[in-house]
Amino acid sequence: MNFETSRCATLQYCPDPYIQRFIETPSHFSWKESYYRSAMSQSTQTSEFLSPEVFQHIWDFLEQPICSVQPIDLNFVDEPSENGATNKIEISMDCIRMQDSDLSDPMWPQYTNLGLLNGMDQQIQNGSSSTSPYNTDHAQNSVTAPSPYAQPSSTFDALSPSPAIPSNTDYPGPHSFDVSFQQSSTAKSATWTYSTELKKLYCQIAKTCPIQIKVMTPPPQGAVIRAMPVYKKAEHVTEVVKRCPNHELSREFNEGQIAPPSHLIRVEGNSHAQYVEDPITGRQSVLVPYEPPQVGTEFTTVLYNFMCNSSCVGGMNRRPILIIVTLETRDGQVLGRRCFEARICACPGRDRKADEDSIRKQQVSDSAKNGDGTKRPFRQNTHGIQMTSIKKRRSPDDELLYLPVRGRETYEMLLKIKESLELMQYLPQHTIETYRQQQQQQHQHLLQKQTSMQSQSSYGNSSPPLNKMNSMNKLPSVSQLINPQQRNALTPTTMPEGMGANIPMMGTHMPMAGDMNGLSPTQALPPPLSMPSTSHCTPPPPYPTDCSIVSFLARLGCSSCLDYFTTQGLTTIYQIEHYSMDDLASLKIPEQFRHAIWKGILDHRQLHDFSSPPHLLRTPSGASTVSVGSSETRGERVIDAVRFTLRQTISFPPRDEWNDFNFDMDSRRNKQQRIKEEGE
């Protein structure tokens, strides 16, 4: 049996010996002629089905579609002997993509395998509506993945900032995208400097300015970094930032440059840079492929040049600009965004010092106005006595401050500290002394209990740290030391202004387990303070932010087992969250630590089931992003179709030649008739 297959695909075929399908062929044809006639009839039907007229209606539906067809043909032929029958199976599959898109878009057409062509090489062909990967050139030459940054079929040409007004909101994204600058000099001779106080870059024209790109997790393959200038003020934001006509038309800085002369931002030292101008909004930007940091570094450095002064007439004309740096996928989805102000001037150090001095003077002036007040003194005459109102001065103790906290445990701990400090102001001195005496007694009892437990504990038991925490929770809280008379006296009307503003977090605090254990059965629970709950922030979800193996083992008290994991390349807890006891034993972890680590993995699983990972949580904002890569969001209609055709042709010799193959139907009928007569 010989198999005639295409060069790039093989499929093992086992013919079914129990085929009971007969094709009646004319008796005056030989078996070869019958086979040829049958095959031709099948191919005729197939050619009609594969003709362009069949899909013409679908193509007309998409007006001006771009189509790509990837055919796969597999032929299996059972070669006959001299006088034998044949069996032929033909399988064809066409992967068709039809898209309603602009014909100038170099991203389409291209092949799509829809996940069915494993191991097949994909090609991107420009200007062709239907190609086949099984031509002679493809078979003879070794196929290598083309560079995604090669000209002219670059994938960056399809990316463009769709919004008319790009967003300037910082968005770290799922990869914690960040942009930073090196330590810069403030001397007048410096070619560039960055002010962290003003979040502003000062640089000279056409001078190299290194910008450091950092991500916590590697972005997808083919990610790019885009830099785009926009005007800062609302009255200018709709205009496109370009170079002034003087610098654009002059030969200086333009001869021998790949970048268009109108682009403000250029990239130095990167041959893969792509300069893009949006055909709709006209905004100009420059794209470079993301490169991971080199060994021993945390940053990826991109060298930018700014090719026009901020004071140039006909260009920026002293209007402030912002530089928006985004991390994007190959199809334009924004993975992170950072923004900073830029000023291109002749003396960056001098301008930075002047701006910082000006902002400091303004802050001092604002603080002085807020302290002295701007209203006139109120005068009131009563019985001939002139009264002047006292000016209110804000006390530093009444100032409201907000502290962002990461982690539920830290938040609850700081909440208790805040509650205790505020309640301390209303406790009498003898109550405080009684509390301190009880605290010392509890501390001595805790030390004795901990000493006895350490002498009885065995290896592998992680209960001592937990028991220690439980003992700490059983300590009496400050709220229990207040008698009912003092507690009823704590009302919003008797508290100072600063105290009443900070109390809402106390009003939402529920008694802990340790607080309820300190109460007697007959003693009622202390009523909570009736304060409106107007907390300005929502606590973060109970999910561990540090997911490294080091911190995981440190929490379990098993830091000595770190080498067993790092030698196997295990660095995060997500790599071992599905491990079993057998897997831990295979890592040769000592038995005394194995149970503690297994219990920690189970706790992590339970926590993981009821919370979302931090890299999947996004803060909603009004930031607009570019296209998310879906053709639906771009207003395009895409139809992906896969057509399978299975055709089996079985040919037998004519009836006159059946006697040669012991397949005489007349003799079989006579034999069956004789058996029937003998049975009667």
From Swiss-Prot:
Residue span of region Transcription activation: 1-107
Annotated Zn(2+) binding sites: 244, 247, 308, 312
Region (Oligomerization): 394-443
Example of a GO cellular component annotation carried by this entry: nucleoplasm
Entry note about domains: The transactivation inhibitory domain (TID) can interact with, and inhibit the activity of the N-terminal transcriptional activation domain of TA*-type isoforms.
Key words, A-Z: Activator, Apoptosis, Developmental protein, DNA-binding, Isopeptide bond, Metal-binding, Notch signaling pathway, Nucleus, Transcription, Transcription regulation, Ubl conjugation, Zinc
Protein name in UniProt: Tumor protein 63
GO molecular function: chromatin binding; damaged DNA binding; DNA binding; DNA-binding transcription activator activity, RNA polymerase II-specific; DNA-binding transcription factor activity; DNA-binding transcription factor activity, RNA polymerase II-specific; double-stranded DNA binding; identical protein binding
UniProt modification remark: May be sumoylated.
A GO BP entry: ectoderm and mesoderm interaction
DNA-binding region per UniProt: 170-362
Skewed-composition ranges (Low complexity): 437-463
Originating gene: Tp63
Disulfide bonds: none
Region called Disordered, residue ranges: 122-171, 351-393, 436-472
Originating species: Rattus norvegicus (Rat)
Organs and tissues of expression: Widely expressed, notably in thymus, prostate, placenta, and skeletal muscle, although the precise isoform varies according to tissue type. Progenitor cell layers of skin, breast and prostate express high levels of DeltaN-type isoforms.
Top-level lineage group: Eukaryota
Pfam families: P53, P53_tetramer, SAM_2
Key word Phosphoprotein present: no
Family: Belongs to the p53 family.
Record-linked PANTHER family: CELLULAR TUMOR ANTIGEN P53, TUMOR PROTEIN 63
Location of region: Interaction with HIPK2: 352-388
Family matches, as SUPFAM superfamilies: p53 tetramerization domain (SSF47719), p53-like transcription factors (SSF49417), SAM/Pointed domain (SSF47769)
